[in-house]
Swiss-Prot record:
Keywords: Autocatalytic cleavage, DNA damage, DNA repair, DNA replication, DNA-binding, Hydrolase, Repressor, SOS response, Transcription, Transcription regulation. It comes from Rhodospirillum centenum (strain ATCC 51521 / SW). The keyword Electron transport does not apply. SUPFAM superfamilies: LexA/Signal peptidase (SSF51306), Winged helix' DNA-binding domain (SSF46785). Gene3D superfamilies: Umud Fragment, subunit A, Winged helix-like DNA-binding domain superfamily/Winged helix DNA-binding domain. Belongs to the peptidase S24 family. Homodimer. One of its GO terms (molecular function) is DNA binding. It comes from the Bacteria. One of its GO terms (biological process) is proteolysis. This is LexA repressor. It holds the Pfam family LexA_DNA_bind. Represses a number of genes involved in the response to DNA damage (SOS response), including recA and lexA. In the presence of single-stranded DNA, RecA interacts with LexA causing an autocatalytic cleavage which disrupts the DNA-binding part of LexA, leading to derepression of the SOS regulon and eventually DNA repair.
Length: 237
């Protein structure tokens, strides 16, 4: 026999998996059920797991699978969401991006535009970005604005809480400045390129990951150069 909160959480997870194929984050579950802390979500998930309703998928950050539903589930009562909408927050990349990424101008008179495909984003570990200048991808013009753009591929599952799945392609608009909270491609120390959320803290810049298993990294402003911002995502089925 499940408690009402357990049933509500189980149905919430089930609906999110059915709609998007991605488990909700602990923060999303906490807010959906109107709880004040994530410790309550941990207890509910443990109870559901012990009763055989869900299981945690190994080697995947907070990935859950619904094994069964109660015969007479309680109606789902989800608290209204008040937090900032979840933005795309892809993972870490590396490569020689010190030279300007040329990108390509978007064309308003076509249904799709071909963009250079500059590399893959590894799950949890930085890797050398692929710089094959012959690689490209056709992108619907509705995903891009004016200016130069390029694409990066995603590999792995460490960004599933942000809706970024293995095999996704992220679309980046070249820029040298960005507003606080924007997901950017940042060049650190003219050596490492990373795709993170930008947080300015005084004279420092924090590069914020999506996965709580990874630490936010803080640098002096002179060590970080913005190479572009995230504007879209493509997923193949």
């Amino acid at each position: 026999m499940l408690t009402r909160k357990q049933q509500e959480l189980l149905l919430f997870i089930h609906e999110r998996l059915k709609d998007g194929g991605v488990s909700p984050s602990f923060d999303e579950m906490k807010d959906a059920l109107g709880l004040k802390s994530k410790s309550g979500i941990h207890r509910l998930i443990t109870g559901l797991e012990e009763r055989g309703f869900i299981r945690r998928l190994p080697h995947r950050a907070r990935a859950l699978e619904v094994l069964r539903l109660p015969e007479q589930p309680a109606p789902l009562r989800v608290a209204p969401r008040t937090e900032e909408p979840v933005r795309f927050r892809p993972n870490v990349i590396r490569g020689d991006f010190r030279g300007a990424l040329p990108g390509r101008e978007a064309r308003g008179d076509a249904e799709a535009v071909s963009l250079p495909l500059y590399g893959r984003i590894a799950a949890g570990l930085p890797i050398e970005a692929l710089r094959d200048t012959t690689a490209s991808i056709d992108v619907p013009t509705g995903l891009i604005a004016s200016g130069e753009h390029y694409a990066l591929e995603v590999a792995g599952d460490s960004m599933v809480d942000a809706g970024i799945l293995d095999g996704d392609t992220v679309i980046i608009q070249r820029c040298e400045t960005a507003e606080n909270g924007t997901v950017i491609v940042a060049l650190v120390d003219d050596n490492e390129v990373t795709l993170k959320r930008l947080r300015r803290k005084g004279n420092s810049i924090a590069l914020e990951p999506a996965n709580p298993a990874y630490e936010t990294r803080v640098f002096g402003a002179d060590r970080v150069r913005i190479q572009g911002r995230l504007v879209g995502l493509i997923r193949r089925y």
